[in-house]
């Protein structure tokens, strides 16, 4: 009903957060968390990957929709084994959880507030924390593909793909491009196979990525596994068992030398 004085009556609604707001909040969250972690560990490289492990743990538990804090430590141990250097035995990784698990509540609040922008936050968070740690020598040259670029590149994927189709990202970064292809192909193929796990495994067999930075290659692998669980969670309950089913084809150089694919004679290993 129009008010008598000619004003237009409006209904006030709470605005949804924008992608820019989500990115800004993620930067702030990353800075605060990294400073707390590195303030205690005084090791930029380890602090960076502990931060990523904590964030990945939070994302996994959100996908799993499990409120049990008793199992979060087990999830952290599982995920951190793929992100932290192999010399960090379970006892060391468990001590990291005991020291910094309080940060998870901040991550949970972020995911709840910006639920529409959870995809790929792991790789973006790595980019932000990498610039803070300044330990790899690669942070000044890393460029992460924006979503609009990925959408432009992937819109040409045919609706009917063959079993022999292969998708390669030779500089895969945090795996955002491959993650979007995984999502797109899952939508196309799931109804045909009617088996979500088999569908995801078949798609992973067609996705390949190489990354010069071994830490970022590990992030890409974890990022893809989280995306796989997000898709799986749409049709069934997920668990740590499902996590162990998937092994993305992400590779990095055995002995990184800065040349990557430009090196005439280089060998790679698959991220575990």
Regions found by a protein language model. Give the residues of each.
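Non-catalytic, mostly N-terminal accessory regions of nucleic-acid modification and defense proteins
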Residues: 1-143, 232-236, 240-242
